[in-house]
């Protein structure tokens, strides 16, 4: 008994001393770090993140607050989980958090961070961003390729119409990936990259999903650099293998495009424009590697994030048929039943837009923003944030915060139809709803993403009635974590045409 009491006393002294020293260490010249879980030696809070880090971090935020600090491996990480906290980092201190931390995804998938997403904030990043906005992603550029979207959507409608006649189910993600990759291919390369659905497009879809999933993993080597060479999770091996596949595909596209340049005289596409303007006034020149990395960004993010949002929206409407019927009723009243939805109709469809916003809120394409890192130490809400601290904004948690949203777990588009919420815009200025991020490093494809989701979702809802296959009793709404938030079980549906047969075709 004496020994046990001595051990207990020793343990108590050790714990008290440990807590006291830890508290002292968290204060630097009177500057206190944000609160957060203590974790373990060396590995820190890594085990606490689990398979669904956005969910785990949201639960921690309820205990530790809107701004919390974790030691993840040997790296410090600060997490913002409310609109005000996100605004402090992404607006007030935007410039200080304008860079990305080094990570395996940037190294092995993005050509050593030679792309636009992971590039250092500087002249090369600005040139990549400028060319992308000017020739593909900006407002004027989007108008210029509106016919491409409409025509490719016609191909998708015809395919779905044929499947409905044959009694075949539609695998939504596959259909969307096929259409979006072809839209982007026509803008970038002047060609549909997939002529027929089949093995090739399914392999491309699997590659995109794998990239967005593996790039979102919390890789041990990123947080404990001395262990990176061991690749304990096998993540880096998978990234290298996947990169070889993408590089082969991009190299083939690049070479075929170069060989057919004579066909585009006077009608340059995106890649032609980038090649023509690869130098800037500051002496920066985009290499072939930079351009291939940019194409990788555009093809992967351009297909996966938008298709995920549309798939989630359709799943929510099939789970809540009254919402689907209300959306169709609005479209029937505004558009009628004799033609397809046009992009110019969308401003007159407030309920459709509310559905899209509600999807962005409840199922943000990126649950955790792509990480940033502090260039210098700073103070946020009275807390000291050291230099080289990684920043993660929990967009998923903000969208489900009961302090911000009434009944946040309910899919209720009507919340965006009246009052203050009706003015909320998802383009980065209203921090209650930032599905594309905010600040300098906001997703370059924000405008395109919103246009694609509203237009394609609206067209699918207006053109077809939707129901689950007969053997599906209850729709699975579980998530699969990654850079993009996928449905764990892909949505499959039976569709029935609602419009005249001539609507289901490409443009004449």
Swiss-Prot record:
GO cellular component: endoplasmic reticulum
Residues that, per the record, bind heme: 443
Family: Belongs to the cytochrome P450 family.
Organism: Petunia hybrida (Petunia)
Molecular function in Gene Ontology: flavonoid 3',5'-hydroxylase activity; heme binding; iron ion binding
Record's protein name: Flavonoid 3',5'-hydroxylase 2
Pathway field: Pigment biosynthesis; anthocyanin biosynthesis
PANTHER family: CYTOCHROME P450 98A9, FLAVONOID 3'-MONOOXYGENASE
Top EC group: oxidoreductase
Any single Pfam family the record assigns to this protein: p450
Keyword NADP: yes
Compartments where located: Microsome; Endoplasmic reticulum
Superkingdom to which the source organism belongs: Eukaryota
InterPro entries reported for this sequence: Cyt_P450, Cyt_P450_CS, Cyt_P450_E_grp-I, Cyt_P450_sf
Cofactor(s) annotated in UniProt: heme
Keywords tagged on the record: Endoplasmic reticulum, Heme, Iron, Metal-binding, Microsome, Monooxygenase, NADP, Oxidoreductase
Reported function: Catalyzes the 3'5'-hydroxylation of naringenin and eriodictyol to form 5,7,3,'4',5'-pentahydroxyflavanone and 3',5'-hydroxylation of dihydrokaempferol and dihydroquercetin to form dihydromyricetin.
Enzyme Commission number: 1.14.14.81
UniProt GO BP: anthocyanin-containing compound biosynthetic process
Substrates-to-products reaction catalysed: a 3',5'-unsubstituted flavanone + 2 reduced [NADPH--hemoprotein reductase] + 2 O2 = a 3',5'-dihydroxyflavanone + 2 oxidized [NADPH--hemoprotein reductase] + 2 H2O + 2 H(+)
Tissue: Flowers.
């Amino acid at each position: 008994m004496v020994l046990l009491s001595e051990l207990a006393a020793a343990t108590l002294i050790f714990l008290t001393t440990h807590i006291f020293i830890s508290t002292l260490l968290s204060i630097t010249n009177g500057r206190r770090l944000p609160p957060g879980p203590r974790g373990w030696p060396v590995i820190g809070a890594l085990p606490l993140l689990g398979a669904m880090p956005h969910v785990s971090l949201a639960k921690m935020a309820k205990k530790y607050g809107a701004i919390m600090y974790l030691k993840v491996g040997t790296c410090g990480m600060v997490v913002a989980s409310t609109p005000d906290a996100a605004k402090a980092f992404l607006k007030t201190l935007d410039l200080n958090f304008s860079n990305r931390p080094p990570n395996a995804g940037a190294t092995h998938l993005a050509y050593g961070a030679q792309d636009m997403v992971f590039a250092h904030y500087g002249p090369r990043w600005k040139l990549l961003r400028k060319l992308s906005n000017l020739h593909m992603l900006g407002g004027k550029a989007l108008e210029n390729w509106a016919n491409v979207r409409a025509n490719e959507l016609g191909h998708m409608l015809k395919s779905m119409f044929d499947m409905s006649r044959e009694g075949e189910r539609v695998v939504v993600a596959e259909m969307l990936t096929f259409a979006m990759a072809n839209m982007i291919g026509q803008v970038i390369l002047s060609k549909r990259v997939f002529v027929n659905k089949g093995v090739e497009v399914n392999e491309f879809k699997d590659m995109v999903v794998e990239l967005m999933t593996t790039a979102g993993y919390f890789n041990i080597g990123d947080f404990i650099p001395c262990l990176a060479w061991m690749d304990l999770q096998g993540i880096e091996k998978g990234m290298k293998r996947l990169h070889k596949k993408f590089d082969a595909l991009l190299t083939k596209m690049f070479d075929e495009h170069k060989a057919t340049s004579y066909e585009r005289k006077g009608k340059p596409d995106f890649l032609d424009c980038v090649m023509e303007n690869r130098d800037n006034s500051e002496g920066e020149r985009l290499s072939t590697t930079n351009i291939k990395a940019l194409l990788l960004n555009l093809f992967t993010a351009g297909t996966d994030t938008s298709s995920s949002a549309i798939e989630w929206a359709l799943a929510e409407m099939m789970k809540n048929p009254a919402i689907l019927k209300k959306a169709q009723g609005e479209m029937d009243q505004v558009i009628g039943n004799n033609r397809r939805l046009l992009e110019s109709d969308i401003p007159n469809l407030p309920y459709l837009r509310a559905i899209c916003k509600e999807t962005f809120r409840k199922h943000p394409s990126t649950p955790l923003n792509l990480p940033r890192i502090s260039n210098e130490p700073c103070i946020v809400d009275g807390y000291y944030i050291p230099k080289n601290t990684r920043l993660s904004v929990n967009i998923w948690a903000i969208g489900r915060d009961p302090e911000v949203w009434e009944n946040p777990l309910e899919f209720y588009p009507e919340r965006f139809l009246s009052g203050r919420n009706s003015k909320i815009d998802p383009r980065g200025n209203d921090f209650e709803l930032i599905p594309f991020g905010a600040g300098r490093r906001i997703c370059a494809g924000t405008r395109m993403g919103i246009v694609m989701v509203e237009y394609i979702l609206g067209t699918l809802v207006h053109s077809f009635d939707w129901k689950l296959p007969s053997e599906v009793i209850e729709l699975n709404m579980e998530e699969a974590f990654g850079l993009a938030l996928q449905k764990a079980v892909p949505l499959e549906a039976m569709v029935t045409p609602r419009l005249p047969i001539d609507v289901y075709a490409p443009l004449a």
